[in-house]
């Protein structure tokens, strides 16, 4: 959250605020550089976040200097050459990271992301002129209380404005990722994007197609973790970026739902995302959980169903989410969780469910994911604009599930009283799908009746299952 008092500070009060927050260790690092005869300034996002009351959110401290990387490496014991090609090294001092970059201006950008080369310069003013946004183009020397603000960044902080340093067209052609970063900063800070800057975002958005999927993913994740991600996602739609980032979500704008929802599919998805907990997995799950509704509606209409219904929309939503997650290189672990949450978010518990049905539900969803699935259901309810919190039936289901978990019921194949080795030894089998199929069939029996989970009983049941599977296989081969 932003400290509103901070952005109302005068120039002199800004200096006082910076002086009060900067740590002794940071002063030691700066003094080490200055005592060696070089200039050293705190710069960029670190200053911005201090002035906005967000210093605790900024892990790295950014420093600009006229010292070359090799000269910095001689001054400190632990230095990592993180971006030495572009003049950047990272100093580790008392477990704090300091990203130190030589004053520079960037030469021509060949890949719309990185400069082909950099040219070192001797003063901070030239260095600040190459930066992306005015609120990031600040520099401060705490030893003489000099705050350099060549591009009215302090004023833009006060006005809550995201504005490029200089010509937005040139800034975006230099580094197209700045297009997404502008929207991400707008979302995380709840700032407006200056009119000319936003016009150029709309004109230049196709440049993002030249940026790696991983870079866009990282910016999108940061946007999702803002206090109100719907703010940033709406900017993605207005700027036409959403049309190629998540085209299915973009096309859900204006797709009306039934009387149980106050909002269309698009805004319902955004508000559900806002209502979910601050994790990438939960926010993506909430954002995509209903994105398959337009396709589901089309399929229903094509089948002659005239009502405004969305049968199997969770199936289509999972497919759309999977496509996005693979395209933007999310981890397999995240993909597995997100797709499973979307797949099962339409669960419908009634009091007629048997204990076996409850166990089967926990088994297919996974015990670890149950709390996340319920959290998604709550976010879904909040996002429809009419319902808030847990209905009584959902609380009853939650209690039932917790009882099953507390009583250590067998819910997975590994919970069975026998394993694959027992199956192979008993029937003289080698590792195969047949062994796995027998274990799956045994688990289905145990989910219905926990009393069956005894070794002698399961081996007896396994023999019946084995004979049936072999018989079915023989009949299939004869029909061939």
Protein language model regions, located:
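Catalytic cores of the polymerase beta-like nucleotidyltransferase superfamily
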Residues: 1-480
């Amino acid at each position: 959250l932003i400290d509103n008092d901070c952005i109302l500070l005068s120039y002199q009060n800004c200096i006082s605020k910076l002086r009060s927050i900067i740590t002794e260790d940071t002063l030691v690092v700066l003094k080490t550089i200055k005592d060696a005869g070089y200039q050293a300034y705190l710069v960029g996002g670190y200053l911005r976040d201090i002035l906005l009351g967000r210093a605790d959110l900024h892990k790295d401290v950014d420093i600009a200097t006229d010292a070359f990387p090799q000269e910095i490496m001689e001054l400190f014991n632990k230095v990592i050459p993180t971006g030495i090609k572009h003049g950047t090294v990272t100093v580790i001092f008392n477990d704090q990271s300091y990203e130190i970059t030589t004053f520079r201006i960037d030469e021509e950008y060949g890949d719309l992301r990185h400069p082909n080369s950099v040219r070192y310069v001797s003063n901070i003013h030239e260095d600040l002129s190459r930066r992306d946004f005015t609120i990031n183009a600040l520099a401060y020397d705490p030893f003489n209380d000099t705050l350099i603000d060549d591009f009215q960044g302090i004023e833009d902080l006060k006005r809550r404005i995201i504005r490029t340093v200089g010509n937005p067209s040139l800034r975006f052609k230099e580094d197209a990722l700045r297009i997404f970063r502008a929207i991400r900063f707008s979302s995380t800070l709840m700032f407006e994007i200056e009119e000319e800057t936003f016009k150029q975002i709309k004109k230049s958005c196709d440049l993002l197609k030249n940026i790696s999927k991983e870079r866009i993913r990282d910016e999108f994740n940061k946007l999702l973790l803002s206090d109100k991600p719907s703010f940033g996602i709406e900017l993605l739609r207005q700027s036409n970026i959403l049309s190629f980032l998540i085209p299915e979500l973009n096309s859900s704008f204006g797709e009306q739902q039934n009387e149980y929802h106050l909002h269309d599919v698009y805004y319902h998805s955004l508000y559900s995302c806002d209502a979910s907990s601050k994790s990438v997995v939960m926010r993506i799950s909430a954002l995509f959980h209903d994105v398959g509704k337009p396709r589901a509606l089309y399929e229903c209409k094509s089948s002659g169903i005239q009502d405004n219904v969305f049968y199997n929309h969770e199936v289509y939503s999972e497919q759309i989410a999977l496509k996005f997650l693979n395209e933007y290189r999310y981890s397999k672990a995240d993909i597995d969780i997100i797709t499973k949450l979307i797949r099962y978010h339409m669960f419908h518990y009634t009091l007629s469910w048997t204990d076996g049905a409850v166990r089967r539900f926990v088994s297919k969803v996974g015990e670890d994911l149950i709390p996340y699935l319920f959290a998604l259901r709550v976010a879904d309810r909040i996002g429809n604009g009419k319902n808030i919190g847990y209905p009584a039936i959902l609380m009853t289901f939650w209690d039932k599930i917790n009882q099953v978990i507390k009583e250590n019921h067998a819910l997975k194949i590994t919970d069975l009283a026998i394993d694959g080795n027992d199956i192979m030894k008993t029937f003289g089998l080698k590792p195969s799908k047949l062994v796995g199929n027998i274990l799956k069939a045994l688990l289905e029996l145990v989910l219905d009746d926990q009393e069956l989970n005894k070794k002698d009983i399961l081996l007896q049941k396994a023999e019946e299952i084995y004979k049936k599977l072999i018989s079915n296989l023989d009949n299939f081969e004869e029909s061939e």
